[in-house]
């Protein structure tokens, strides 16, 4: 292990969470993070928007940056095949990460890959097939309801009840209602037109492992295919669906070269093609929300694509899907790790040398083969007006990504016991060199560390550890590139004490404590240097012409951020560890946080450059409770984890605030700031009686059904002085619950996870009024809008044009969004060996898996058509059902 050498779990003083590899394979998703979401307290994994490959983000105890390691070496987590994983380590406290130097404050996940075990070769084959289904899609209104609301919004803006847009007069509405002519009066359900209800997924895996006295091996081959939800045109010679095809391979080989020399060679590769329509997957999900159902028909009577008169291009969504071409990104990832360990017992018992060299390369090439198509406006007289024109498919390509990591490490270690005393020492020098062609012109980033670690173990009872690192990063200014980080820890294996054994209560009793000073370098390349460029300026007495000007303000004093981390924990086991409990309390204090000050100066004429100007802290508790037992042939377990966290924004250079509620200091980190809503104006009399309004939304523009804001300072004006902390974007609590059993060949497992005290801000398309003058879709949620007959405080009125009052960031649009999600269920049956051995097969297991089967959330009380983790114009959260067979030889 790059960070520790080798240590048994019972000898650890750090706080490291472990997830077994079987927990990863039991979840039917190819995204590694999605498989471990909710399984570890302190590890927050959350769904992000975008296309399929960019689905998840993660933080460890709200880390500002993240680092993903495979066998202790930096990698891309998308390269992981679940069957390659032996275990997952989550490095939580500072003591476990100090040796990472200028990235030691990061949240760290370290995946340990499988190695061969002594014995004959073991072959394993797994085949899975299943399907995905979108959990939630916005419930969009049909044409009649849409037009009714648009007319109502139009009448509201005019303050003329019953007014309507001439194009949507009552006679026209009846034509829509009666579906008189779907070409002139279309009513299109774009989700139904573009998307299938389900999308198939397939996965096949083969691996072989084994070991002899001189070498061990593990070889894994994996193929995965995931289709998207888009409908396709069989007439096309190319695929326009959002589809992922991935092939990965790994070979881990350990060779005992001599009795004192061991060599580990790890090779891994992955090739993936992600195909999508030329317009991009995400654009369709977002464009559906901006296309009203009666904008144009999908097809005209003659079979051509429908369009509309003010269109300057062919924007027919079906045409964009079928006849706009496609694009695909080919990604290739390759890694090679070589480690040689040489025992030096002939010099000193327990002395060894270790050297590691590693190379990782990731490249991707984006090919776009787009074409254009003609669409037509169908007129009432039966004539057509062409929009756009047919053009042949083109072909363009470019390198989308080039990313390389070179890692070199040399280490001297010592591990020896003297009676009851065990001493271990590790001294490491390592270089991690990163080149990303997409970041800062591909300039090399060099992380250099010189580290030392000392461990002392007395009689497996008293454990102590100290670690020191001098870390450097070449993008900082020359005088600021190096920093010192250190940590200490201690633990007591109380269960090994004779007086504790006599109590016959604890099978494990291990309190532990650690404290570390860690850091992270956050800066751009040569941010400390002044750069210049040309721009047109007017000098006194001279012409308006190009001149050399300063491009940036230098950050010459930028230093690494500092994170001081304290962790106090205890591990308890009872009844021979059938009942186990772990508790941790942590306090992470971040100082010298890199940010841009809000203070501006007229003399400078610009904002200040980034500097180490902020401070904030996180404190939290984490708990894990497990019970596992066996009753004859019935084995079962239940596990629960729970974490709570509080944060505090402690310092930032701010302009003086007129009122205390305007300051961020003392607030939790990551808050939403805005106006405090005080209900809805229910009548004109309420508006007349109120005396505080926005300058951009004066009293005369306010109508019943608009939001009323609190005048916090009592100056009769709603402005910046009335903005305050509205709520947290981050959950304060996370939990996970798992249980399972196996009995006479049957096995079952279930896992659920959720959040506590979480809020979301629903604005934009989720507001009651379109504000787009009748363009864009409207959801069924808006049917509950405020009207003279529906005096609600949960919805505003609808509006047609702009609405400066209701569109302000305010507490009105913030909702509780805690959720409980049945994340994974798996049921399997292993055929009797008496049956399978007749076929020459030692083990055959058939199984079914389900992912995201049930979700319960407070947000459903507000909107039933959105998922609490992701919504709107992004690739939706999906439910997956898988069926599989596993054969072991």
Q: Can you say where each PLM-predicted feature lies in the sequence?
A:
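C-terminal extracellular loops and terminal segments
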Residues: 608-617, 656-672, 721, 725-740, ...
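Short, small/polar-rich motifs associated with maturation and membrane association
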Residues: 1-249, 263, 703, 713, ...
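Conserved small-residue
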Residues: 124-181, 279-280, 527, 614, ...
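Glycine-rich, aromatic-lined ligand/substrate-binding cores of catalytic
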Residues: 728-761
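Extracytoplasmic gating/loop element in the C-terminal half of outer-membrane beta-barrel translocons
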Residues: 297-304, 319, 755-845, 850
């Amino acid at each position: 292990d790059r960070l520790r050498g080798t240590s048994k779990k019972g000898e650890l003083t750090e706080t490291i969470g472990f997830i077994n590899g079987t927990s990863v394979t039991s979840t039917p998703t190819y995204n590694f993070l999605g498989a471990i979401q909710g399984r570890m307290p302190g590890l927050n994994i959350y769904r992000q928007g975008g296309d399929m490959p960019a689905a998840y983000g993660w933080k460890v105890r709200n880390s500002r940056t993240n680092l993903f390691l495979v066998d202790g070496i930096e990698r891309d987590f998308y390269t992981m095949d679940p069957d390659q994983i032996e275990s997952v380590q989550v490095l939580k406290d500072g003591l476990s990460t100090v040796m990472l130097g200028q990235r030691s404050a990061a949240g760290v996940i370290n995946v340990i890959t499988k190695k061969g075990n002594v014995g004959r070769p073991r072959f394993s084959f797994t085949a899975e097939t299943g399907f995905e289904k979108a959990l939630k899609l916005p419930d969009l209104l049909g044409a009649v309801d849409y037009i009714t609301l648009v007319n109502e919004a139009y009448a509201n803006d005019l303050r003329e009840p019953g007014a309507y847009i001439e194009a949507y007069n009552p006679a026209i509405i009846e034509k829509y209602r009666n579906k008189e002519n779907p070409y002139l009066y279309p009513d299109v359900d774009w989700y139904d037109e573009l998307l299938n209800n389900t999308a198939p997924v397939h996965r096949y895996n083969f691996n072989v492992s084994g070991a002899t006295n001189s070498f061990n091996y593990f070889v894994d081959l994996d193929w995965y295919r995931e289709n998207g939800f888009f409908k396709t045109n069989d007439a096309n010679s190319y695929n326009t669906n959002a589809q992922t095809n991935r092939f990965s391979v790994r070979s881990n080989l350990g060779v005992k070269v001599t009795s004192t020399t061991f060599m580990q060679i790890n090779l891994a590769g992955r090739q993936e093609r992600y195909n999508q329509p030329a317009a991009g997957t995400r654009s369709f999900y977002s464009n559906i929300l901006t296309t009203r159902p009666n904008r144009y028909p999908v097809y005209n009577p003659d079979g051509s694509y429908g369009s509309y008169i003010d269109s300057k291009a062919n924007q027919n969504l079906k045409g964009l899907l079928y006849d706009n071409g496609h694009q695909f990104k080919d990604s290739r990832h390759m890694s090679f790790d070589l480690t040689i360990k040489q025992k030096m017992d002939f010099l000193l018992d327990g002395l060894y040398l270790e050297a590691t060299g590693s190379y990782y390369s990731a490249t991707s090439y984006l090919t776009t083969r787009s074409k254009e198509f003609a669409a037509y406006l169908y007129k009432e007289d039966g004539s057509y007006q062409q929009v756009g024109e047919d053009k042949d498919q083109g072909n363009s390509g470019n390198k989308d990504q080039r990313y390389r990591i070179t890692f070199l490490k040399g280490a001297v270690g010592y591990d020896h016991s003297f009676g009851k005393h065990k001493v271990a020492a590790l001294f490491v020098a390592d270089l991690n060199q990163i080149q990303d062609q997409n970041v800062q012109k591909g300039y090399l980033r060099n992380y250099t560390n010189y580290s030392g670690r000392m461990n002392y173990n007395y009689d497996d009872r008293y454990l102590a550890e100290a670690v020191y690192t001098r870390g450097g990063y070449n993008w900082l200014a020359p005088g600021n590139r190096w920093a010192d980080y250190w940590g200490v820890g201690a633990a007591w294996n109380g269960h090994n004490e004779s007086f504790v054994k006599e109590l016959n209560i604890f099978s494990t009793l291990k309190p532990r404590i650690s404290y570390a000073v860690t850091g992270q370098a956050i800066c751009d390349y040569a941010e400390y240097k002044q750069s210049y460029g040309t721009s047109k300026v007017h000098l006194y007495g001279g012409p308006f012409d190009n001149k050399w000007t300063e491009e940036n303000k230098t950050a010459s004093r930028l230093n690494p951020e500092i994170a001081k981390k304290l962790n106090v924990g205890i591990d308890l086991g009872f009844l021979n560890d059938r009942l186990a409990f772990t508790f941790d309390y942590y306090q992470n204090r971040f100082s010298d946080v890199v940010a841009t000050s809000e203070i501006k100066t007229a003399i400078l004429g610009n904002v200040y450059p980034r500097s180490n100007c902020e401070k904030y802290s996180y404190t939290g508790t984490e708990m894990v409770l497990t019970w596992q037992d066996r009753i004859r042939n019935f084995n079962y377990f239940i596990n629960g984890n729970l974490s709570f966290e509080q944060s505090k924004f402690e310092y930032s250079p701010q302009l003086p605030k007129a009122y205390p509620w305007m300051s961020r200091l003392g607030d939790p980190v990551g808050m939403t700031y805005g106006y405090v809503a005080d209900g809805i104006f229910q009548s004109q009399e309420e508006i007349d009686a109120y005396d505080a309004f926005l300058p951009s939304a004066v009293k005369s523009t306010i109508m019943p059904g608009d939001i009323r804001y609190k005048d916090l300072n009592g100056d009769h004006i709603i402005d910046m002085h009335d903005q305050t902390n509205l709520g947290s974007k981050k959950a304060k609590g996370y939990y996970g619950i798992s249980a399972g059993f196996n009995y006479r060949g049957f096995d079952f497992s279930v896992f659920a996870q959720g959040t506590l005290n979480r809020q979301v801000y629903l604005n934009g398309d989720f507001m009651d009024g379109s504000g787009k003058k009748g363009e864009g879709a409207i959801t069924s949620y808006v049917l509950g809008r405020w009207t003279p007959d529906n005096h609600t405080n949960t919805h505003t009125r609808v509006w047609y044009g702009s609405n400066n009052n209701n569109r302000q960031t305010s507490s009105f649009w913030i909702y509780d969004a805690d959720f409980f999600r049945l994340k994974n269920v798996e049921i399997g049956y292993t055929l009797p060996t008496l049956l399978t051995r007749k076929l020459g097969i030692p083990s055959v297991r058939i199984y079914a898996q389900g992912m995201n089967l049930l979700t319960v959330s407070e947000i459903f009380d507000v909107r039933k058509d959105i998922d609490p983790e992701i919504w709107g114009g992004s690739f939706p959260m999906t439910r997956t059902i898988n069926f599989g067979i596993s054969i072991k030889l």
